[in-house]
Amino acid sequence: GVGCSSGCHKVGGQCRCG
């Protein structure tokens, strides 16, 4: 999502990867 690194997604306002 916007503001997250490639391969990451936003969860609870934070970016998570993997």
Swiss-Prot record:
Keyword Nucleotidyltransferase attached: no
Keyword terms of this UniProt record: Amidation, Disulfide bond, Secreted, Toxin
Keyword Disulfide bond: yes
Residue numbers bearing the Glycine amide modification: 18
Disulfide bonds: 4-15, 8-17
Annotated Gene Ontology cellular component terms: extracellular region
Domain of life: Eukaryota
Tissues in which the protein is found: Expressed by the venom gland.
Compartments where located: Secreted
Molecular function GO labels: toxin activity
Family: Belongs to the poneritoxin-Ae1 family.
Protein name: U1-poneritoxin-Ae1e
